Design a protein with these regions (language model features):
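Walker B catalytic motif
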Residues: 168-172, 179
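ABC ATPase NBD Q-loop/coupling interface
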Residues: 59-75, 143
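Conserved structural motif at the start of ABC-family nucleotide-binding domains
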Residues: 2-4, 17
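Hydrophobic anchor residue at the start of the ABC signature
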Residues: 43, 155-156, 176
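The feature captures the beta-strand-to-loop junction immediately N-terminal to the Walker
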Residues: 33-35
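Short coil-to-beta microelement around the adenine-binding A-loop and adjacent beta1/P-loop entry
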Residues: 14-17, 74, 182
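ABC-family P-loop ATPase nucleotide-binding domains
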Residues: 88-165
Protein backbone atom coordinates (compact mmCIF):
# COMPACT_ATOMS: atom_id res chain seq x y z
CA UNK A 1 0.00 0.00 0.00
CA UNK A 2 2.68 2.51 1.09
CA UNK A 3 6.37 2.19 0.26
CA UNK A 4 8.92 4.79 1.30
CA UNK A 5 12.49 4.30 0.14
CA UNK A 6 15.55 6.31 1.16
CA UNK A 7 13.49 9.46 1.81
CA UNK A 8 15.57 12.56 2.53
CA UNK A 9 13.96 15.94 3.22
CA UNK A 10 14.89 19.41 4.35
CA UNK A 11 13.31 22.68 5.36
CA UNK A 12 15.21 25.93 4.69
CA UNK A 13 18.40 23.96 3.94
CA UNK A 14 18.15 22.05 7.25
CA UNK A 15 18.08 18.28 6.81
CA UNK A 16 15.18 16.70 8.67
CA UNK A 17 14.73 13.16 7.35
CA UNK A 18 17.82 11.26 6.26
CA UNK A 19 17.12 7.99 4.49
CA UNK A 20 13.74 6.82 5.83
CA UNK A 21 12.51 3.42 4.61
CA UNK A 22 9.05 2.10 5.44
CA UNK A 23 6.61 -0.38 3.96
CA UNK A 24 2.97 -0.52 5.07
CA UNK A 25 0.64 -3.24 3.83
CA UNK A 26 -3.18 -2.93 3.87
CA UNK A 27 -4.59 -3.52 7.34
CA UNK A 28 -1.30 -2.90 9.14
CA UNK A 29 -0.92 -0.38 11.94
CA UNK A 30 2.45 1.29 12.46
CA UNK A 31 3.45 3.56 15.33
CA UNK A 32 6.40 5.80 14.58
CA UNK A 33 8.01 6.86 17.81
CA UNK A 34 10.97 9.02 18.68
CA UNK A 35 12.06 12.05 20.67
CA UNK A 36 10.89 15.58 19.92
CA UNK A 37 12.48 16.91 16.76
CA UNK A 38 13.24 13.50 15.28
CA UNK A 39 11.06 14.05 12.19
CA UNK A 40 7.80 12.23 12.98
CA UNK A 41 5.59 15.22 12.12
CA UNK A 42 7.80 16.02 9.14
CA UNK A 43 7.23 12.52 7.77
CA UNK A 44 3.47 12.92 8.23
CA UNK A 45 3.55 16.31 6.49
CA UNK A 46 5.61 15.00 3.57
CA UNK A 47 3.20 12.08 3.13
CA UNK A 48 0.33 14.58 2.98
CA UNK A 49 2.11 16.75 0.41
CA UNK A 50 2.73 19.84 2.52
CA UNK A 51 4.89 22.06 0.37
CA UNK A 52 7.22 23.60 2.98
CA UNK A 53 9.11 20.30 3.12
CA UNK A 54 11.50 19.73 0.24
CA UNK A 55 12.13 16.13 -0.76
CA UNK A 56 15.81 15.95 -1.66
CA UNK A 57 15.79 12.30 -2.72
CA UNK A 58 13.90 9.08 -2.32
CA UNK A 59 10.51 7.80 -3.33
CA UNK A 60 7.07 7.56 -1.77
CA UNK A 61 4.66 5.23 -3.51
CA UNK A 62 1.05 4.91 -2.44
CA UNK A 63 -0.95 2.19 -4.18
CA UNK A 64 1.90 1.92 -6.72
CA UNK A 65 1.72 5.63 -7.60
CA UNK A 66 4.57 8.04 -6.88
CA UNK A 67 3.22 10.84 -4.69
CA UNK A 68 6.33 13.02 -4.27
CA UNK A 69 5.47 16.30 -5.97
CA UNK A 70 1.70 15.86 -5.80
CA UNK A 71 -0.38 18.55 -4.13
CA UNK A 72 -2.15 17.91 -0.81
CA UNK A 73 -5.45 17.85 -2.73
CA UNK A 74 -4.19 15.22 -5.17
CA UNK A 75 -2.85 13.11 -2.31
CA UNK A 76 -6.13 13.35 -0.39
CA UNK A 77 -8.03 12.27 -3.51
CA UNK A 78 -5.87 9.15 -3.60
CA UNK A 79 -7.21 8.31 -0.13
CA UNK A 80 -4.61 9.59 2.36
CA UNK A 81 -5.93 11.35 5.48
CA UNK A 82 -3.74 13.40 7.84
CA UNK A 83 -4.88 14.21 11.36
CA UNK A 84 -2.89 17.26 12.39
CA UNK A 85 -0.90 17.56 15.60
CA UNK A 86 -2.38 21.05 16.05
CA UNK A 87 -5.74 21.24 14.21
CA UNK A 88 -6.60 24.74 12.99
CA UNK A 89 -9.75 26.67 13.81
CA UNK A 90 -11.99 27.74 10.93
CA UNK A 91 -14.62 30.05 12.44
CA UNK A 92 -17.75 30.53 10.36
CA UNK A 93 -17.45 27.22 8.50
CA UNK A 94 -19.70 24.61 10.08
CA UNK A 95 -18.51 21.05 10.37
CA UNK A 96 -21.58 19.91 8.42
CA UNK A 97 -20.93 22.24 5.48
CA UNK A 98 -17.23 21.41 5.48
CA UNK A 99 -17.81 17.66 5.43
CA UNK A 100 -20.48 17.94 2.72
CA UNK A 101 -18.03 19.91 0.57
CA UNK A 102 -15.27 17.35 1.22
CA UNK A 103 -17.46 14.39 0.32
CA UNK A 104 -18.89 16.14 -2.76
CA UNK A 105 -15.37 16.98 -3.95
CA UNK A 106 -14.23 13.40 -3.45
CA UNK A 107 -17.25 12.01 -5.32
CA UNK A 108 -16.66 14.46 -8.17
CA UNK A 109 -13.00 13.44 -8.41
CA UNK A 110 -14.03 9.77 -8.51
CA UNK A 111 -16.72 10.51 -11.14
CA UNK A 112 -19.43 9.41 -8.73
CA UNK A 113 -22.71 11.24 -8.15
CA UNK A 114 -22.93 13.44 -5.07
CA UNK A 115 -24.26 11.77 -1.95
CA UNK A 116 -27.97 12.58 -1.53
CA UNK A 117 -28.60 15.00 1.35
CA UNK A 118 -30.68 12.45 3.26
CA UNK A 119 -27.89 9.85 3.08
CA UNK A 120 -25.33 12.46 4.11
CA UNK A 121 -27.38 13.53 7.15
CA UNK A 122 -27.91 9.91 8.15
CA UNK A 123 -24.18 9.21 7.91
CA UNK A 124 -23.39 12.36 9.95
CA UNK A 125 -25.83 11.36 12.71
CA UNK A 126 -24.56 7.76 12.82
CA UNK A 127 -20.97 8.98 13.11
CA UNK A 128 -21.94 11.43 15.86
CA UNK A 129 -23.62 8.61 17.75
CA UNK A 130 -20.64 6.29 17.39
CA UNK A 131 -18.36 8.93 18.94
CA UNK A 132 -20.89 10.10 21.55
CA UNK A 133 -21.00 13.57 19.99
CA UNK A 134 -24.09 15.76 20.31
CA UNK A 135 -25.47 16.54 16.83
CA UNK A 136 -25.48 20.26 17.75
CA UNK A 137 -21.74 19.98 17.21
CA UNK A 138 -22.32 19.81 13.46
CA UNK A 139 -23.34 23.47 13.28
CA UNK A 140 -20.27 24.73 15.17
CA UNK A 141 -17.36 26.30 13.35
CA UNK A 142 -14.56 23.83 12.70
CA UNK A 143 -12.56 23.59 15.93
CA UNK A 144 -13.84 27.05 16.90
CA UNK A 145 -13.52 27.21 20.67
CA UNK A 146 -12.92 23.46 20.89
CA UNK A 147 -10.80 21.98 23.65
CA UNK A 148 -7.78 19.92 22.65
CA UNK A 149 -9.75 16.72 23.10
CA UNK A 150 -12.70 18.04 21.10
CA UNK A 151 -10.33 18.91 18.26
CA UNK A 152 -8.98 15.37 18.25
CA UNK A 153 -12.49 13.92 18.38
CA UNK A 154 -13.44 16.19 15.46
CA UNK A 155 -10.55 14.83 13.42
CA UNK A 156 -11.58 11.25 14.21
CA UNK A 157 -15.12 12.22 13.15
CA UNK A 158 -13.81 13.56 9.83
CA UNK A 159 -11.67 10.46 9.30
CA UNK A 160 -14.62 8.14 9.87
CA UNK A 161 -16.77 10.07 7.41
CA UNK A 162 -14.10 10.20 4.72
CA UNK A 163 -13.10 6.54 5.19
CA UNK A 164 -9.55 6.95 3.83
CA UNK A 165 -7.39 4.14 2.51
CA UNK A 166 -4.51 5.35 4.73
CA UNK A 167 -4.85 7.44 7.90
CA UNK A 168 -1.86 9.26 9.35
CA UNK A 169 -2.52 10.36 12.91
CA UNK A 170 0.06 12.87 14.14
CA UNK A 171 0.31 13.11 17.95
CA UNK A 172 -3.15 11.67 18.50
CA UNK A 173 -2.88 12.02 22.26
CA UNK A 174 -1.79 15.68 22.49
CA UNK A 175 -4.42 17.89 24.11
CA UNK A 176 -6.78 15.04 24.97
CA UNK A 177 -9.36 15.49 27.67
CA UNK A 178 -10.61 12.66 29.85
CA UNK A 179 -13.85 12.28 27.82
CA UNK A 180 -11.87 11.80 24.61
CA UNK A 181 -10.00 8.90 26.19
CA UNK A 182 -13.28 6.95 26.30
CA UNK A 183 -13.59 6.84 22.48
Amino acid sequence: MLNISNLKTEINNTKILNGINLSVKPGEVHAIMGPNGSGKSTLASVLAGKEEHEVISGNIQFLNEEIVGLSPEEISHLGIFLSFQYPVEIPGVSLMNFMKACLDQRHEKLNKPAMPASDFLKKMRETCKSLNIDSDWLSRGINDGFSGGEKKRNEIFQMLLLNPKLAILDETDSGLDIDALKI
